[in-house]
Amino acid sequence: MATVDRWLLPDGIEEVLPPEAARIEIARRQVLDLFQSWGYELVVTPHIEYLESLLTGAGQDLDQRTFKVVDPQSGRLMGFRADFTPQVARIDAHTLRREGPSRLCYAGSVLHAQPRALSTSRSPIQLGAELYGDASPTSDVEVISLMLATLQLTDVADVHMDLGHVGIYRGLARAAGLSGAVEQQLFDALQRKSVDEVQALTADLPKDLGNMLRALVELCGGREVLAEARVRLGRAPASVLAALDDLLAIADRLASRYPELPLYFDLGELRGYNYHTGVVFAVFVPGEGQSIAQGGRYDDIGADFGRARPATGFSTDLKTLVTLGRAEVVLPAGGIWMPDSGDAALWQQVCQLRNEGQRVVQALPGQPLSAALEADCDRQLIQQDGRWQVLPLTH
């Protein structure tokens, strides 16, 4: 590599400089404090671990986004975490092994081999919260509410939410006896809203099931979609009707708590279909092609760790929230310039100032007073009348 190229970073990998790094860190602390106030406990997971553990229950999408390396000590394949959820699920199922509900949260960098979308970061700072041990819509509403509180804390404006339920499609596909290949083809067609493909793939099914699967393309819009779904899917299996009931219960609670929040329903939206088992949700803002926060229910993710506990949660990228948020993050302003001196009294004074939360920068040998300005100092320590005093910086 030529010297001129050594400063280049890989596509989608970025460094964060001051003061943006300080804004992100302050926001991280604020969000974790918010999570704690809701009863969520922080966990810290490994950056890298054996691949079979990292991808357990996570589906093919996560496999494709995971950087893989060979462990030089064991010779086993390892992966850098691309998502916290499988790791947190292992902690709940195998390590904590609590009988009752467990609320866990996290914040840290993840690494993606492939970007989520064009021009998106491959090294986001993922933060999120997960609730294990309760299968009711109440838990889904809780994590959605915490997600909205996170967006409110960072002052992300003009949000709207998409809601769906993968159990609706899964129940219809199971009733139709679709093979794995056809189920995947139909899934792909539904995501693209391809009416002709959906029609062709369901043409040979029993009339009622074919009509209900085709209806999923059109069952998208406002609150009225849920009432329409009750009619058009009225002959669906009990599991599908139960999924509709759950979605309605969640929508009712959200509408009560957030009457100004636009809710959009799409019963053909199957985000995370490979591992989600129930409600799925995502938040969008104008001007962003991808969701800025997302989540759902994934009751089976802990099965490979010995406990298939009910689970629901959400995640978001902290760097995106700080970029989009309008909240003013107040950074510590100014500082105190400390002269280069071996005076013990000066050192005691500096220690006291720092303990009080003051920012004190020491001059290095040969540095002129003008260097204090580059260090963002507006005051200085000067010895007067036999003691060190903090005075305005003189130019």
Swiss-Prot record:
Keywords: Amino-acid biosynthesis, Cytoplasm, Histidine biosynthesis. Its main location: cytoplasm. Pfam families: tRNA-synt_His. GO terms for biological process: L-histidine biosynthetic process. The keyword Cytoplasm applies. One of its GO terms (cellular component) is cytoplasm. Pathway: Amino-acid biosynthesis; L-histidine biosynthesis; L-histidine from 5-phospho-alpha-D-ribose 1-diphosphate: step 1/9. InterPro entries: aa-tRNA-synth_II/BPL/LPL (IPR045864), HisRS-like_core (IPR041715), HisRS/HisZ (IPR004516), HisZ (IPR004517). It is found in: Cytoplasm. Required for the first step of histidine biosynthesis. May allow the feedback regulation of ATP phosphoribosyltransferase activity by histidine. Belongs to the class-II aminoacyl-tRNA synthetase family. HisZ subfamily. HAMAP family: HisZ (MF_00125). NCBIfam families: hisZ_biosyn_reg, PRK12292.1-1, PRK12292.1-4, PRK12421.1. Heteromultimer composed of HisG and HisZ subunits. This function is generally fulfilled by the C-terminal part of HisG, which is missing in some bacteria such as this one. PANTHER family: HISTIDINE--TRNA LIGASE, HISTIDYL-TRNA SYNTHETASE. This is ATP phosphoribosyltransferase regulatory subunit. The gene is hisZ.
